[in-house]
Swiss-Prot record:
InterPro entries per record: AB_hydrolase_fold, LYPA1-2/EST-like, PLipase/COase/thioEstase
Entry-linked Gene3D superfamilies: alpha/beta hydrolase
UniProt protein name: Acyl-protein thioesterase 2
The organism's place on the tree of life at top rank: Eukaryota
PANTHER family given in the database record: ACYL-PROTEIN THIOESTERASE 2, LYSOPHOSPHOLIPASE-RELATED
Gene Ontology cellular-component terms listed: cytoplasm; cytosol; Golgi stack
Role summary: Acts as an acyl-protein thioesterase hydrolyzing fatty acids from S-acylated cysteine residues in proteins such as trimeric G alpha proteins, GSDMD, GAP43, ZDHHC6 or HRAS. Deacylates GAP43. Mediates depalmitoylation of ZDHHC6. Has lysophospholipase activity. Hydrolyzes prostaglandin glycerol esters (PG-Gs) in the following order prostaglandin D2-glycerol ester (PGD2-G) > prostaglandin E2 glycerol ester (PGE2-G) > prostaglandin F2-alpha-glycerol ester (PGF2-alpha-G). Hydrolyzes 1-arachidonoylglycerol but not 2-arachidonoylglycerol or arachidonoylethanolamide.
Organism from which the protein derives: Rattus norvegicus
One GO term (biological process): fatty acid metabolic process
EC number(s) given by UniProt: 3.1.2.-, 3.1.2.22
Keyword check for Kinase: no
Pfam families to which the protein is assigned, alphabetical: Abhydrolase_2
Keywords: Cytoplasm, Fatty acid metabolism, Hydrolase, Lipid metabolism, Lipoprotein, Palmitate, Phosphoprotein
Active site: 122, 176, 210
Length: 231
C-alpha cells in the first residue's frame, strides 16, 4: 500500500486482511467496547472476498463511565445503553472524524468511496452508522451488528445528502441483554427515515445474545458480495 500511514493514526497498527487478488474494494470494520480489531479481522477472514481489503482499527483506551470509569478500548465514552441515555456528543463526533480520515486515506490510494463499506459490532457498529450517515463521500453501505444509531435525535437532519442511497445491513440477536433487540428495531425505523427505506435490511437471530453467529456472518458475506462485486 502506498501513502503515508502516519497521518492516519488509526491505520498505523490496525489489523488488516489483505486481498488475495488486486484490491478494488475495502471494508472498514470497527470492534465493540473493550475489544480490539484482531478478533474481527479473524472473523472477517473466514468470509473474505479475494478483491477486498479488510481494515479493523483498534479504538483508543479511555475511561468509560458505564464501566465505573475503567480504562479500556472505546471509540467514545458511554454513559448508558438505552435510547434515552445521555451521550458523549463531542467524543462521537471526534471518533467519526478519525474514521472519515481513514476512509479518505483509502480513497487517496485508489479505492473509490462507492467501493468502501463501513461496518462494526456494538459500539463500533454505532460509530459506523453515525460516520457513514454524516460522511461527505457516498459510501457503498454499512454493516451494523448488534448496535444503535448515536445522537439519533439529530437525524435525519444531520445526515449528508448522499446518505439516502446507502445500503444498510442491520443484524441483532433476539436475546441480546446488552443492547436489546427492541433498541435495534427502533434504530431500523429511524434509519428508514434517513436512507431509502427499501435499502435497510433488519435481520434478527433467535437464541443469539450480544454476539455474532454463523448465519449472521453468512448474511454479511452475501451483502458484501452484492455491494462489492469484482470489477
Amino acid at each position: 500500500m502506498c501513502g503515508n500511514n502516519m497521518s492516519v493514526p488509526l491505520l498505523t497498527d490496525a489489523a488488516t486482511v489483505s486481498g488475495a487478488e488486486r484490491e478494488t474494494a475495502a471494508v472498514i470494520f470497527l470492534h465493540g467496547l473493550g475489544d480490539t480489531g484482531h478478533s474481527w479481522a479473524d472473523a472477517l477472514s473466514t468470509i473474505r472476498l479475494p478483491h477486498v481489503k479488510y481494515i479493523c482499527p483498534h479504538a483508543p483506551r479511555i475511561p468509560v463511565t458505564l464501566n465505573m470509569k475503567m480504562v479500556m478500548p472505546s471509540w467514545f465514552d458511554l454513559m448508558g445503553l438505552s435510547p434515552d441515555a445521555p451521550e458523549d456528543e463531542a467524543g462521537i463526533k471526534k471518533a467519526a472524524e478519525n474514521i472519515k480520515a481513514l476512509i479518505e486515506h483509502e480513497m487517496k490510494n485508489g479505492i473509490p468511496a462507492n467501493r468502501i463499506v463501513l461496518g462494526g459490532f456494538s459500539q463500533g457498529g454505532a460509530l459506523s452508522l453515525y460516520t457513514a450517515l454524516t460522511c461527505p463521500h457516498p459510501l457503498a453501505g454499512i454493516v451494523a451488528l448488534s448496535c444503535w444509531l448515536p445522537l439519533h435525535r439529530n437525524f435525519p437532519q444531520a445526515a449528508n445528502g448522499s446518505a439516502k442511497d446507502l445500503a444498510i445491513l442491520q443484524c441483532h440477536g433476539e436475546l441480546d441483554p446488552m443492547v436489546p433487540v427492541r433498541f435495534g428495531a427502533l434504530t431500523a425505523e429511524k434509519l428508514r427515515t434517513v436512507v431509502t427505506p427499501a435499502r435497510v435490511q433488519f435481520k434478527t437471530y433467535p437464541g443469539v445474545m450480544h454476539s455474532s453467529c454463523p448465519q449472521e456472518m453468512a448474511a454479511v458475506k452475501e451483502f458484501l458480495e452484492k455491494l462489492l462485486p469484482p470489477v
